[in-house]
Amino acid sequence: TLVIIMEHSKPVNRLQSAGISLATVPQVRGLPNSQDPKLNSHSKLNCIIACLQAEAAGADEGLMLDPHGFVNTTNACNFFIVRRGAVWTSTGDYCMNGITRRKVIDLCRANGIPVFERNFSLVDTYGADEAFLTGTFGAQTPVASIDGRQIGTGEMGPMTLRLRDLYKDLIKQ
């Protein structure tokens, strides 16, 4: 039996400019030998649980750690931070290698923006100048706060705006 539930939504303009809130959730991204987190064809129960945990915490999305305690992804999107002009994202070992994620990494490299796929901690995240999410639906969505802590100015930062503009130019081609 195959069940497909389609949903059509529009981005909330307020969230696209003002940013969203994240809460670190206890649900982690799974190990590849139990449910490969890089594939979009398995049950998404862990992401659904993370979404419910974020909602219970009063956040828009749940920030998920990998099995080793490093920041990884959210329940629905890939996660990036900006520190001192450099863009950081997870190694990709425990998240979907999303098309928008890959395009943002490629855009950074093509435009001389330092970008790192690395392990990083919640402390690194709390001290970030900016944070944003990538996804097909929201492109580059700014993160205003994580666990009640304001990130940067609490609004879309200059790097997120630059990457959003570069991405829009790319998809126009």
Where is each model-derived feature located?
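Helix-start/capping segments and mature chain N-termini
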Residues: T1-Q173
